[in-house]
């Protein structure tokens, strides 16, 4: 992915400046104790699990933002902070997570690294549940925005057909998920998944194959309900379009927020 491209750079500086102002005014803070001191002592790499928390308006829900990077990097600059800025400007609380990658996950094989990364997301949700009052968030009413690898993590946490899903770890499921160019193309909805709403966009030209999720849509819609699945596959769209600036989907974010609000009720 060419992260220096126009798709990303125009949003990046504004997002960093916005975050800097929030940190200075006390409206944003780095959370570095998601894993306990004991866990970090046992495995120092676990100190790499952190979150930048943006405090939103009272009564507005929380968005957890999970950037991608193929489990070899964290693309927070493109898929984290610009998204968080847009959400926070609308009043939402936001947690942008940065998670261990590569050998830090304790695995060498790519698929196992992905599974280990899902367990990092589990730990984030556990932390949020334990700190609801302190952070003024309601974990019965939250969403996850995941991009690329982060979208795979979001899928695997939210759907019951995965090993480390919310049901199995007994943690709250998001009301709505947004696995952008990241909805697992093998996803399968089970009865337990009823009540979950899914919004996703991918391109047919996606070089990692995320457009292949199209074949799963009839099954998803039959279980979750037509109104709860907004997944679109576009021609002439590749991977890694971030917030969508200068692409054929410049308004996906506004559509996503509309979908979220419609499914909070």
What do these predicted regions represent?
Residues 60-68:
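Short beta-strand element of the alpha/beta-hydrolase
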Residues 67-72, 204:
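Active-site glycine-rich loops that stabilize anionic/oxyanionic intermediates
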Residues 168-226, 230:
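The feature captures the conserved acid-bearing segment of alpha/beta-hydrolase catalytic domains
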Residues 119-193:
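Primarily recognizes the serine-hydrolase "nucleophile elbow" in alpha/beta-hydrolase
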Residues 75, 100-135, 246-249:
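Catalytic nucleophile-loop/oxyanion-hole region of alpha/beta-hydrolase
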Residues 2-9:
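Short, small-residue-biased leader/transition segments that mark boundaries at the very start
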Residues 225-265:
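C-terminal catalytic histidine-bearing segment of alpha/beta-hydrolase fold enzymes
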Residues 77-95:
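Short amphipathic alpha-helix adjacent to the substrate-entry channel of hydrolases
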């Amino acid at each position: 992915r060419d992260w220096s491209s126009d798709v990303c750079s125009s949003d990046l500086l504004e997002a960093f400046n916005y975050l800097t102002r929030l940190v200075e005014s006390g409206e944003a803070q780095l959370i570095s104790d998601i894993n306990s001191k004991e866990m970090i002592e046992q495995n120092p790499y676990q100190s790499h699990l952190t979150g930048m928390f943006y405090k939103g308006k009272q009564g507005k829900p929380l968005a957890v933002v999970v950037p991608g990077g193929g489990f070899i990097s964290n693309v927070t600059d493109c898929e984290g902070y610009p998204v968080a800025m847009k959400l926070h400007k609308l009043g939402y609380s936001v947690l942008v997570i940065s998670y261990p990658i590569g050998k830090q996950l304790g695995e060498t094989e790519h698929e196992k690294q992905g599974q280990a990364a899902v367990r990092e997301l589990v730990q984030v949700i556990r932390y949020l549940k334990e700190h609801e009052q302190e952070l003024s968030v309601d974990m019965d009413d939250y969403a996850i925005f995941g991009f690329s690898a982060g979208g795979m993590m979001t899928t695997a946490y939210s759907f019951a057909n995965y090993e480390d899903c919310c049901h199995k770890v007994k943690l709250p499921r998001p009301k709505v998920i947004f696995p952008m160019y990241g909805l697992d193309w093998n996803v399968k909805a089970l009865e337990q998944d009823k009540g979950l709403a899914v919004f996703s966009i991918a391109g047919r030209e996606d070089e990692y194959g995320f457009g292949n999720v199209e074949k799963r849509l009839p099954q998803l819609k039959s279980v979750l309900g037509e109104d709860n699945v907004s997944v679109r596959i576009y021609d002439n769209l590749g991977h890694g379009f971030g917030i969508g600036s200068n692409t054929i989907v410049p308004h996906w974010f506004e559509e996503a927020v509309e979908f979220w609000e419609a499914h909070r009720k």
